[in-house]
């Protein structure tokens, strides 16, 4: 193709994403668009086609963004090239959404005709507006008995501020309104800007590791053209590679002769090392480089931290390689090596939220076949010392000595909760119990209320979402943004077994709840830890001060069983001998700690119950994460 043909082709390209709250019909709409454009044959078609991960199908959620090319012949007789980028809906995967939107010019906003606007709907709209995208409202599920499209149309106009007079009324499940959506994409989504004759500038929005071809880059071509045989250069580190293949996804990878301005596809260049590429980098040609890199992505800071350890210590290097490969595919994952006296060598990992953490653990176990132990999650605290230094601490074991601490700041989030009016009282009570500060409350319509609180992230991390769902019978929707750090009365609580600190059981707690939580944990550990041949004291301590204690009584053999009567001094001698042996055993003995002990730090009440699947626990119906039953020896 010559330059003129490429420019005409560029005018026929439409790049768009589908954004929505969880379960509003994003993936189903994507399926119907694939069917309507005959991208996938009826034989290959299946529900959630773009959700290629087993985990996505099982949970019914989208975790990874997916890019796919479609051809659509519009009513004007012209054939258009659509690039559809499917996005996740959960708050933990906002980073995936932001990267998808940066590769688009338009976004289809899907809103459930029965449920209306929810918290994540707003969050995704703001992301789309930040990227200056053309937003096309679609009111989905109009065939539901509870559907009220007119109410939702007014909500879109009043709450978001979009003109919804031309919003498409659709049912992705029944295939209603799909053609109208496609025509609106042609008419309203602008063609990509960019110059095909300019030096190559391609934005890496995702990447994946292939055992045979190395790192495969998923790119949006902003300017220029790239084809097999070109020598490309990474603008962040200057490294060069020879392109072996370029192509598109349909959704299978299909090789092409070139990728030009406006295209979304993949580039394979025998990139062997994971560290050579990063999401948000700009690719250019080595012999005709662009003058400057594209504006990349804002790096997402992890909000939740947890330790990940291999059950078999010889799998440490395998775990490192697995995390590196996952990081390539999930740029928001961060990790660094750490050592625990109880758990050995592992990694301190940073996640965007609890679901993100759960998904990473399951991917490590499934895709890389590594059995893991995870510690309870924590957040990043700012510890100000008496030397006027500020230390960022995400691991309780790294907390400085209490005598050196001047004050501690913890992260607060702005929590936005949308809930029916009848549950407002329950939401406010829960938020205040979690140390939240009321900000404002707005009525979306006659029945639905938007409540905003400032809540410590540490309270959100544990069980806030589960308790919110149970107290509102599942009707609440919830979204949060990082707000600020505030000074709080926080203390580090250590758990001592037989007088020894167990670093993996330490946690940070507000001073007001320290005694209560310490007491709950020692009682739980008493039930979980098996009885030993000697008495084991379990203590909860803040610094040198013991705030709670419970003892596991020793297993005791009846040494008097053979004494049928006889002198009492003989019995006393046997009992004294047993007592001395127990004392000696206590001094040198070790305590077996089952893995459930680490979970007890997390679940502070008794509503944690087991389900039929082994080694898993549920909290109010929500799967937290898998814990292995390996027993650990605390010397």
Curated annotation (Swiss-Prot):
Its EC number is 3.6.5.n1. Keywords: Cell membrane, GTP-binding, Hydrolase, Membrane, Nucleotide-binding, Protein biosynthesis. GTP binds at residues 23-28, 140-143. One of its GO terms (molecular function) is GTP binding. GO terms for biological process: positive regulation of translation. It catalyses: GTP + H2O = GDP + phosphate + H(+). Disulfide bonds: none annotated. It is found in: Cell membrane. Its main location: membrane. SUPFAM superfamilies: EF-G C-terminal domain-like, P-loop containing nucleoside triphosphate hydrolases, Translation proteins. The keyword tRNA-binding does not apply. Residues 11-193 form the tr-type G domain. It is a peripheral membrane protein. GO terms for cellular component: plasma membrane. Required for accurate and efficient protein synthesis under certain stress conditions. May act as a fidelity factor of the translation reaction, by catalyzing a one-codon backward translocation of tRNAs on improperly translocated ribosomes. Back-translocation proceeds from a post-translocation (POST) complex to a pre-translocation (PRE) complex, thus giving elongation factor G a second chance to translocate the tRNAs correctly. Binds to ribosomes in a GTP-dependent manner. Belongs to the TRAFAC class translation factor GTPase superfamily. Classic translation factor GTPase family. LepA subfamily. This is Elongation factor 4. It comes from Streptococcus pyogenes serotype M12 (strain MGAS2096).
């Amino acid at each position: 193709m010559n330059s003129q043909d490429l420019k005409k082709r560029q005018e026929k390209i439409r790049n768009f994403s589908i954004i929505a709250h969880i379960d509003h019909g994003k993936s189903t709409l994507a399926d119907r668009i694939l069917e309507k454009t005959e991208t996938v044959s009826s034989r290959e078609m299946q529900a959630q086609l773009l959700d290629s991960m087993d985990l996505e199908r099982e949970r019914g959620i989208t975790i990874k963004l997916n890019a796919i090319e479609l051809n659509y012949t519009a009513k004007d007789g012209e054939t258009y090239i659509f690039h559809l980028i499917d996005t996740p809906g959960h708050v933990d995967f906002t980073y995936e959404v932001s990267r998808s939107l940066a590769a688009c010019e338009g976004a289809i906003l899907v809103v459930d005709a029965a449920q209306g606007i929810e918290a994540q709907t707003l969050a995704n709209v703001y992301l789309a507006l930040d990227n200056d995208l053309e937003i096309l409202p679609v009111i989905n599920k109009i065939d539901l008995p509870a559907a009220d499209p007119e109410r939702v149309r007014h909500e879109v106009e009043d709450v978001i501020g979009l003109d919804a007079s031309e919003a498409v009324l659709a049912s992705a499940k029944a295939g209603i309104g799909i053609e109208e959506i496609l025509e609106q994409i042609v008419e309203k989504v602008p063609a990509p800007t960019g110059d095909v004759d300019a030096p190559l500038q391609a934005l890496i929005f995702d990447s994946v590791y292939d055992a045979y071809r190395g790192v495969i880059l998923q790119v949006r071509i902003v300017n220029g053209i790239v084809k097999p045989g070109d020598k490309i250069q990474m603008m962040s580190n200057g490294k060069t590679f020879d392109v072996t293949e370029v192509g598109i996804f349909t959704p299978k990878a299909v090789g092409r002769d070139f990728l030009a301005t406006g295209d979304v596809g993949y580039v394979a260049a025998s990139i062997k090392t994971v560290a050579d590429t990063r999401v948000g980098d700009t690719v250019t040609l080595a012999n005709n480089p662009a003058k400057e890199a594209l504006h990349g992505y804002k790096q997402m800071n992890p909000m939740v931290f947890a330790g990940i350890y291999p059950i078999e210590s010889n799998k440490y290097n395998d775990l490192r390689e697995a995390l590196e490969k996952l990081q390539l595919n999930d740029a928001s994952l961060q990790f660094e090596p750490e050592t625990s006296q109880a758990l050995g060598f592992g990694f301190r990992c940073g996640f965007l939220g609890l679901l993100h953490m759960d998904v990473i653990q399951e991917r490590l176990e499934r895709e890389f076949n590594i059995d893991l132990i995870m510690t309870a999650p924590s957040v990043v605290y700012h510890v100000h010392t008496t030397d006027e230094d500020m230390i960022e601490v995400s691991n309780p074991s790294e907390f400085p000595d209490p005598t050196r601490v001047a004050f501690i700041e913890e992260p607060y989030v702005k929590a936005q909760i949308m809930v029916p009016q009848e549950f407002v009282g329950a939401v406010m009570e829960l938020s205040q119990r979690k140390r939240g500060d009321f900000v404002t409350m707005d009525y979306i319509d006659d029945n639905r209320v938007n409540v905003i609180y400032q809540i410590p992230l540490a309270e959100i991390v544990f069980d806030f979402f589960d308790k919110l769902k149970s107290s509102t019978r599942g009707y609440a929707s919830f979204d949060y943004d990082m707000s600020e750090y505030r000074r709080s009365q926080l203390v580090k609580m250590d758990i001592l077994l037989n007088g020894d600190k167990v670093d993996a059981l330490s946690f940070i707690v507000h001073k007001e709840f320290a005694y209560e939580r310490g007491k709950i944990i020692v009682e739980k550990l008493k039930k979980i830890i098996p009885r030993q041949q000697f008495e084991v004291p379990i203590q909860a301590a803040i610094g040198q001060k013991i705030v709670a204690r419970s003892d596991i009584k020793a297993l005791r053999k009846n040494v008097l069983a053979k004494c049928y009567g006889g002198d009492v001094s003989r019995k006393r001698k046997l009992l004294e001998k047993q007592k001395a042996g127990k004392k000696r055993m206590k001094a040198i003995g070790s305590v077996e700690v089952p893995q459930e002990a680490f979970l007890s730090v997390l679940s502070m009440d008794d509503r944690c119950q087991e389900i039929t699947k082994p080694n898993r626990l549920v909290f109010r119906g929500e799967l937290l994460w898998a814990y292995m039953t390996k027993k650990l020896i605390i010397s």
